[in-house]
Amino acid sequence: MAARPLVTVYDEKYEATQSQIRLPAVFRTPIRPDLVSFIADQVRRNRRQAHAVNTKAGKQHSAESWGTGRAVARIPRVRGGGTHRSGQGAFGNMCRGGHMFAPLKVFRRWHRNVNIAQKRYAVSSAIAASGIPALLQARGHVIDQVAEVPLVVSDKVESFRKTKEAVVFLRRSHLWADIEKVYNSKRNRAGKGKLRNRQHKQKLGPVVIYGQDAECARAFRNIPGVDVMNVERLNLLKLAPGGHLGRLIIWTESAFKKLDTIYGTTVANSSQLKKGWSVPLPIMANSDFSRIIRSEEVVKAIRAPKKNPVLPKVHRNPLKKRTLLYKLNPYASILRKASKANVKK
């Protein structure tokens, strides 16, 4: 949770202006990585396309079992002769050239219904995590020279039309190092995805969130790793790619001011666009547990420790505890040694 009450607005030349904006209440949302990971996985499933294997795959042979009495398995075998293929097993999922086990069907349950309250909570938590520099650096963003997080810039950025204007802005705001990280991370994908129109993979850079439909999307879209979104249509898969918190966000001034209107405050039902929604409050106002248990209020309510406590007497079984048996009957050790000697004779 960001602790600063005010956020400075920077112009397109990355110079601090006189205007300051109060930090929206959504940045005080409790950070729930478990919820964000789960909801991101559910939302990602809704983008899947139904696919299946051919119903004839692995079954296009003339094969029949040889039956019993041949000292071979009763799996169907290819008919004929004159080739290595004849006599080989067919059809079964354990056979070369056979069908797969449990072939994929198009009527699989591909999509998931996502709880809207959990989805809003996850988006709010992802926004709150974007205001913590430690989480941004843990995710791999290069923000060593960034003056302030969350980073808010003037609305002149929304009027950018050319990519070269966006590049100049990113260089001035010391964010180009994060873009160079994206360039250097481009590599070949492992697996068969290379054959399916996704040969390369690379890291992600910052995401630009604007307030009104502007032309800045055309300026930033051709820069590798940079995403652009409208503040009224935020996508959890871009705020927390892979379900991981800590995406670097560049807010425009108008978008930053709309957050209280969209996501509300700590007052119940304060959101104007999301019915019945307000910013979730943390269960513990102070998460420093050691400070709580050492506070005067808690110490006064707790009984002082006893100086000479009377411990209850523990009754032990001497038949199972040999040391206790020897205390009660010292001669038992002699009897035990004598019995062992008799056994050896």
Curated annotation (Swiss-Prot):
<feature type="modified residue" description="N-acetylalanine">
    <location>
        <position position="2"/>
    </location>
</feature>
<dbReference type="InterPro" id="IPR002136">
    <property type="entry name" value="Ribosomal_uL4"/>
</dbReference>
<keyword id="KW-0007">Acetylation</keyword>
<dbReference type="InterPro" id="IPR025755">
    <property type="entry name" value="Ribos_uL4_C_dom"/>
</dbReference>
<keyword id="KW-0689">Ribosomal protein</keyword>
<dbReference type="GO" id="GO:0022625">
    <property type="term" value="C:cytosolic large ribosomal subunit"/>
</dbReference>
<dbReference type="InterPro" id="IPR023574">
    <property type="entry name" value="Ribosomal_uL4_dom_sf"/>
</dbReference>
<keyword id="KW-0687">Ribonucleoprotein</keyword>
<dbReference type="GO" id="GO:0003723">
    <property type="term" value="F:RNA binding"/>
</dbReference>
<dbReference type="Pfam" id="PF14374">
    <property type="entry name" value="Ribos_L4_asso_C"/>
</dbReference>
<dbReference type="InterPro" id="IPR045240">
    <property type="entry name" value="Ribosomal_uL4_euk/arch"/>
</dbReference>
<dbReference type="GO" id="GO:0003735">
    <property type="term" value="F:structural constituent of ribosome"/>
</dbReference>
<protein>
    <recommendedName>
        <fullName>Large ribosomal subunit protein uL4</fullName>
    </recommendedName>
</protein>
<dbReference type="Pfam" id="PF00573">
    <property type="entry name" value="Ribosomal_L4"/>
</dbReference>
<comment type="similarity">
    <text>Belongs to the universal ribosomal protein uL4 family.</text>
</comment>
<dbReference type="GO" id="GO:0008340">
    <property type="term" value="P:determination of adult lifespan"/>
</dbReference>
<dbReference type="InterPro" id="IPR013000">
    <property type="entry name" value="Ribosomal_uL4_euk/arc_CS"/>
</dbReference>
<dbReference type="GO" id="GO:0006412">
    <property type="term" value="P:translation"/>
</dbReference>
